[in-house]
Regions:
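Intrinsically disordered, low-complexity, positively biased terminal segments
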Residues: 1-84, 90-93, 100
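Residue-level preference for non-acidic, small/hydrophobic
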Residues: 46, 112, 195-198, 225
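A conserved beta-strand-loop-helix scaffold within acyl/acetyltransferase catalytic domains
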Residues: 52, 57-65, 72-187, 227
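Active-site/acyl-donor-binding loops of N-acyltransferases
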Residues: 60-61, 70-77, 209-244
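Active-site catalytic microenvironments for nucleophilic, acid-base chemistry
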Residues: 118, 197, 201-205
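A short pocket-lining beta-strand/turn micro-motif at the edge of beta-sheets
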Residues: 172, 186, 205-210, 221
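Conserved acetyl-CoA-binding loop-helix of GNAT-fold acetyltransferases
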Residues: 187-200
């Protein structure tokens, strides 16, 4: 009998729970632990297979009667900014981005709390405290960092933290794990700006892909991911290219 290697990942299945994307649906997830020296390579391999990361857990939807969640990755080097994207970049030309180590700060946490209160007050993360936020950022065995976005309002003004993104570096791209921004700057489209910045970062690092997570047909809050082209979506026969 062939024995499984002792360090091979073990996969588990969650119990059914309400779907966060589509009403009146239940979701299940398959998950494994991303720990130890193999965690970075396993994270890359699992992301390629449609998984996402949350702290030391890699997970993927495993719903019995639904395949609405589709992994999406942007072709970074081939990306062509639309007129809307160019307007967003111009509007945010005074915002600078800074790569920081995976260390949670109180400044980041205060912005995170304001974002949740304004955008996801009824969500599962609404009650997170500083300790929970610190775990989200720092509890990781993979190659991750937090990218800060700061706006300088004047020649002598301090740069104000307006957005953050927890980002993984994979063997074939960058993965945006979680992002949040100042809800008072709605006109700046900071969520879109962070995606555009990450596409540029991936291309500059000669990484072919930016992983955006799941595109969910029928979910308004996930539909924006279809706007970044060209992109590939993961189906039963592998990754398929979409140019429109």
């Amino acid at each position: 009998v062939t024995k499984e290697p002792r360090d091979a990942p073990q996969f588990y299945l969650t119990s059914p729970a309400p779907c966060p994307y589509l009403p009146d649906r239940l979701e299940r997830k398959v998950f494994t632990h991303l720990i130890g020296l193999r965690a970075p390579s396993l994270n890359s391999a699992l992301t390629l297979a449609g998984f996402r990361r949350s702290q030391t857990i890699g997970y993927r939807p495993a719903c019995e009667d639904c395949r609405a969640c589709v992994s999406v990755r942007v072709k970074a080097a081939e990306f062509s900014a639309s007129r809307t994207h160019r307007r967003i970049l111009k509007k945010n030309q005074y915002i600078s981005s800074h790569t920081q180590p995976k260390h949670a700060t109180h400044e980041q946490f205060q912005l995170f709390r304001r974002y949740l209160s304004a955008r996801h007050a009824d969500g599962g993360m609404a009650d997170m405290g500083m300790g929970d936020f610190q775990m989200m950022v720092e509890d990781s065995h993979v190659d991750t960092r937090i990218i800060e976005y700061r706006l300088k309002s004047g020649p002598n003004a301090c740069e104000k933290l307006v957005a953050c993104c927890l980002t993984d570096r994979l063997s074939d791209g960058l993965s945006m794990v979680y992002s949040f921004y100042d809800p008072d700057l709605e006109e700046h489209s900071l969520g879109a700006f962070m995606i555009l910045d990450h596409i540029s970062r991936a291309a500059c690092e000669d990484l072919p892909h930016l992983y955006l997570g799941y595109y969910v047909s029928g979910s308004r809050k996930m539909s924006y991911k279809a706007r970044y082209l060209p992109q590939e979506r993961l189906g039963l026969e592998g990754w398929s290219r979409f140019d429109a």
